[in-house]
């Protein structure tokens, strides 16, 4: 939380607030509430349902346009009902990370407790053994009230309180009328000498009706007024169904969705004789300074000539830890200056924008010699820090394969973190595969070429390169396509180098994309080359079916694609899963072989998944080939609308 000092209170029916002390400081961003509805048995059915929740709920929430998911898993008495809501100003990647961390924190801070609520800055999580009504009145069950320790001064308090009430009510109105996200942010001009602006944020769960959302927020406004939060320098009331927040500094991402004018400014005082004298004095100073301009320009020219050398020196110094001299030499040749990239992208203009992810924004650029590049400009608030940047640089600079994206250069000037890659005209696989119109560009030949190319790229990483590398974040959006739809694996920020005799690593920092993670990695932090094999299996099924790894698929349940594929495979109906846009223009035996390989790659035990060299052998084989037998994969089923009252 971006605050100097906040005090908290829990208005939680049957919930205990776990805090070692108040006030809450910057280091404490998590507020867990542990319920008293009973405990579950470790390794029992309810515990297993929580584990399924951990692997699936982050995907469902982060892939939703509203960054919201609710549902249930299992049957009574071990059914678990879950709800996750990410703040409307966050992005999909940050949403998935926050929800996953909240689930993990819930189990660590409220061990074996059936009902838990976790409030984080960017997401809210609740799971319990009973459904949670879609009602404003249910918001007080597990509510947290937090306020800034400092009051505003008595001189401005009346005007400040009136401004806060006006702002939070207007923001609440905006959020209630947002039919997709039920989210709003606002700012109001106040007083240049004390608080230039006041900022606010309001949000409800998107499954609430507009009137119910506004009623829920109205209750919070009342609590803020009666509790004298509006006279503080900041305050928030957090509930599972709705929340409201105001500060005297911008605390949300992006521009405010609404702006309110402040009080009319006082008229400027008339110009006095003293003012005229001051103006004349400034003119005299300017006239005296003019002869020095030539000297200043000469100094600037000398500085400019040394800039390129210093840029390279800075980049090498930034990346020097844990890097050998050879690595640094290979990196130094990749340094690009910021002005070149600004010129190439028209100063990072919107019309050059290709897309946006959890790291920041990607732009199309044109270098002076005519080369087209993709410029990945990491946001200042990006989770991808200097270590991830260093990993990507030092790995990609050493790798050379037709199915891996090629790094063109890097820029670290002025606190920027920018990577430039070869430009891929067809962008990422997900932009075609999950687009109802563009998917028609991919006939079976193109799809099989993409599957083959990804498999060859992974074999190079795992077995054939001078390094043994686990990518850890293989997914459709990290597979780029050139003009001929040849695939290239990209984004090595999470990649890890393995020793040649190393088979498995355990990490406490689980990073990647839920839905593509293997069970042993998502649940226990264990990863190996077989993590990438699992992700590849998911990709194969997505490419063949044209479907994401999660969705309703015409039923009253949200299920993952692995589950749907397995059910069709064991019923000898796998042919029904093939993307309808292919028509009948595909070789049935080859498609079924690819489905078999996809299911083989998502086997629950890592040892049962093939090496990528074996996958490539299976893909390139002709005629009848006996493939290994399959076991039932891991998957999760979520009932739609299960949290409705």
UniProtKB/Swiss-Prot annotation:
Q: Which residues are glycosylated?
A: 39, 91, 151, 169
Supply the source organism for this entry. Answer: Oryza sativa subsp. japonica
Entry protein name: Cysteine-rich receptor-like protein kinase 10
- What's an example of a GO molecular-function annotation for this chain? protein serine/threonine kinase activity
Topology relative to the membrane: Single-pass membrane protein
Task: Name the Pfam families on file.
Answer: Pkinase, Stress-antifung
Binding-site list for ATP: 354-362, 376
Query: Where is the protein found, in the record's own terms?
Result: Membrane
Which biological process annotations from GO are given for this protein? defense response to bacterium; immune response; signal transduction
Q: Would you say which domain of life the source belongs to?
A: Eukaryota
The yes or no answer to whether the keyword Nucleus is present is: no
Write the Enzyme Commission number(s) for this entry.
2.7.11.-
- Residues annotated as the enzyme's active site: 473
């Amino acid at each position: 939380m971006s605050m100097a000092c906040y005090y908290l209170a829990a208005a939680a029916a049957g919930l205990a607030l776990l805090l070692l002390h108040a006030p809450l400081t910057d280091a404490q961003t998590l507020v867990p509430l542990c319920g008293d509805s009973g405990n579950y048995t470790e390794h029992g059915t309810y515990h297993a349902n929580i584990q399924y929740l951990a692997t699936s709920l982050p995907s469902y929430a982060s892939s939703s346009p509203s960054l919201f998911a609710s549902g249930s898993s299992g049957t009574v008495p071990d059914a678990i009902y879950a709800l996750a809501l990410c703040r409307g100003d966050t992005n999909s990647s940050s949403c998935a990370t926050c929800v996953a961390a909240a689930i993990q924190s819930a189990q660590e801070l409220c061990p074996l407790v059936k009902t838990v609520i976790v409030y984080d800055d960017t997401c809210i999580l609740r799971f319990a053994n009973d459904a949670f009504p879609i009602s404003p009145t249910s918001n007080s069950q597990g509510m947290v009230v937090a306020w800034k320790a400092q009051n505003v001064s008595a001189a401005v308090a009346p005007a400040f309180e009136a401004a806060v009430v006006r702002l939070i009510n207007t923001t609440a109105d905006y959020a209630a009328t947002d039919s997709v996200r039920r989210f709003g942010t606002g700012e109001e001009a106040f007083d240049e000498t004390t608080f230039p602006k006041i900022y606010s944020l309001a949000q409800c769960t998107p499954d609430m009706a507009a009137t119910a959302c506004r009623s829920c927020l109205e209750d919070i406004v009342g609590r803020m007024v009666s509790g004298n939060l509006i006279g503080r320098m900041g305050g928030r009331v957090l509930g599972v169904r709705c929340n409201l927040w105001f500060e005297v500094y911008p605390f949300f991402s992006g521009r405010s969705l609404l702006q309110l004018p402040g009080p009319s400014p006082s008229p400027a005082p008339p110009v006095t004789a003293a003012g005229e004298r001051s103006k004349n004095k400034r003119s005299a100073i300017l006239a005296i300074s003019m002869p020095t301009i030539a000297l200043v320009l000469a100094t600037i020219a000398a500085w400019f000539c040394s800039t390129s050398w210093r840029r390279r020196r800075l980049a090498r110094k930034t990346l020097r830890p844990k890097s050998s001299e050879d690595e640094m030499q290979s990196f130094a040749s990749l340094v690009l200056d910021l002005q070149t990239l600004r010129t190439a992208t028209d100063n990072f203009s919107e019309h050059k924008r290709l897309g946006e992810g959890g790291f920041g924004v990607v732009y199309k650029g044109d270098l002076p010699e005519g080369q087209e590049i993709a410029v990945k400009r990491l946001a200042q608030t990006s989770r991808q820090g200097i270590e991830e940047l260093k990993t990507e640089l030092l790995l990609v600079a050493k790798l050379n394969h037709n199915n891996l994206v090629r790094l063109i250069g890097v820029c670290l000037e002025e606190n920027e973190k920018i990577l430039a890659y070869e430009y891929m005209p067809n962008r990422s696989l997900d932009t075609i595969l999950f687009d109802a119109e563009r998917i028609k560009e991919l006939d079976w030949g193109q799809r099989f070429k993409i599957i083959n190319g990804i498999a060859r790229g992974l074999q190079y990483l795992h077995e054939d390169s001078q390094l043994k590398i686990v990518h850890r974040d293989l997914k459709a959006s990290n597979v780029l396509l050139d003009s001929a739809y040849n695939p290239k694996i990209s984004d090595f920020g999470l990649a890890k180098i393995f020793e040649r005799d190393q088979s498995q690593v355990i990490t406490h920092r689980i990073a990647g994309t839920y839905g593509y993670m293997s069970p042993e990695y998502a649940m226990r932090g264990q990863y190996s080359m077989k993590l990438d094999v699992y992700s590849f299996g998911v990709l194969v099924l997505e490419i063949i079916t044209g479907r994401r790894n999660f969705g309703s698929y015409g039923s009253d349940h949200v299920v993952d694609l692995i589950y749907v594929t397995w059910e069709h495979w064991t019923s000898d109906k796998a042919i029904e899963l093939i993307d309808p846009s292919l028509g009948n223009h595909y070789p049935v035996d080859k498609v079924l072989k690819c489905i078999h390989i996809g299911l083989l790659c998502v086997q629950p035990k890592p040892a049962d998944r093939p090496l990528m060299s074996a996958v490539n052998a299976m893909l390139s084989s002709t005629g009848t080939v006996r493939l290994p037998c399959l076991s039932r994969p891991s998957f999760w089923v979520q009932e739609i609308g299960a949290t409705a009252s």
